[in-house]
């Protein structure tokens, strides 16, 4: 999908116009040295999160490419790797048949709307399935209809995975990290409302609810 329009050029989508100019500049800066630095001003810390560009710089240095020339292949490689990881997560959560279809749909939509911003595309491809993991981390083990589970049924693997993802995301793109964290807050509010409704529901006695929870 990306290879066809880029086959005749060493530059990435949109060349060196608009925001691609500073992205190419940033990658070139971190190719010349692994030390974190601003894309334009010498001896200043980076203004933007640097993870994607830092690894891109190591990729360029490993292959002996100038930063501007490595930008295109690094964008394609990183997006492809993120798409594969996202598909693997979907397959793990909903099975290969549905997971492959969902992963393909997310990949196509991401390439359609976010490909010019490759580090954003990487986060979207991994972040969409990770939102399911974040929801599971907040809910714990059990059915969605049952609401959040007690503390002893917390899915700690999901909690750790969600925390690691949000932490890494913050080093890649602050805006999308805020989106993912905001979504987690909204999911938490939904669960809190669900708990409140369950507590206020007098149709089932409290001792029966407690006994039902102990049985799980």
Segments from the language model and where they lie:
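Short hydrophobic "helix-edge" motifs at membrane interfaces and signal-peptide entry regions
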Residues: 54, 162-164, 211, 215
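Generic low-polarity alpha-helical segments
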Residues: 60, 134, 175, 215-216
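Perimembrane helix-loop-helix junctions
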Residues: 180-216
């Amino acid at each position: 999908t990306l290879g066809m329009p880029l086959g005749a050029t060493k530059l990435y989508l949109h060349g060196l116009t608009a925001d691609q100019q500073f992205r190419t500049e940033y990658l070139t800066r971190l190719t010349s040295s692994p030390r974190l630095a601003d894309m334009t001003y010498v001896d200043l810390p980076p203004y933007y999160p640097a993870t994607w560009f830092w690894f891109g710089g190591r990729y360029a240095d490993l292959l002996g490419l100038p930063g501007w020339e490595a930008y295109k292949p690094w964008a394609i490689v990183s997006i492809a790797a993120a798409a594969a990881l996202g598909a693997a997560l979907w397959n793990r959560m909903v099975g290969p048949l549905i997971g492959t279809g969902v992963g393909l749909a997310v990949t196509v939509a991401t390439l359609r709307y976010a490909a010019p911003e490759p580090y954003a595309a990487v986060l979207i491809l991994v972040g969409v399935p990770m939102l399911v993991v974040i929801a599971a981390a907040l809910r714990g083990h059990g059915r969605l209809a049952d609401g959040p589970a007690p503390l002893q049924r917390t899915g700690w693997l999901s909690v750790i995975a969600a925390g690691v993802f949000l932490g890494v995301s913050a080093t890649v793109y602050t805006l999308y990290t805020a989106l993912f964290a905001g979504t987690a807050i909204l999911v938490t509010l939904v669960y809190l409302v669900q708990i409140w409704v369950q507590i206020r529901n007098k149709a089932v006695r409290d001792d029966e609810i407690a006994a039902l929870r102990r049985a799980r």
